[in-house]
Swiss-Prot record:
Protein family according to the UniProt entry: Belongs to the PsbZ family.
Organism: Lactuca sativa (Garden lettuce)
Membrane topology: Multi-pass membrane protein
The name this protein goes by in its record: Photosystem II reaction center protein Z
Self-association state and partner proteins as the record states: PSII is composed of 1 copy each of membrane proteins PsbA, PsbB, PsbC, PsbD, PsbE, PsbF, PsbH, PsbI, PsbJ, PsbK, PsbL, PsbM, PsbT, PsbY, PsbZ, Psb30/Ycf12, at least 3 peripheral proteins of the oxygen-evolving complex and a large number of cofactors. It forms dimeric complexes.
Gene3D superfamilies: Photosystem II PsbZ, reaction centre
Length: 62
């Protein structure tokens, strides 16, 4: 269970780092938002899901 929690936290940190870099790049590019809207929404949905997963796993471990 601890390994699953650690992997979920690592995935959350990695996803946060990727979104931190990619979202401003998408907004700054001339045609970026209209062509990459689905990718940004998918990444945001993944991030929200990982936040809830980490919270659930944390309550099971503690």
């Amino acid at each position: 269970m601890t390994l699953a929690f650690q992997l979920a936290v690592f995935a959350l940190i990695a996803t946060s780092s990727i979104l931190l870099i990619s979202v401003p790049v998408v907004f700054a590019s001339p045609d970026g938002w209209s062509s990459n809207k689905n990718v940004v929404f998918s990444g945001t949905s993944l991030w929200i899901g990982l936040v809830f997963l980490v919270g659930i796993l944390n309550s099971l471990i503690s």
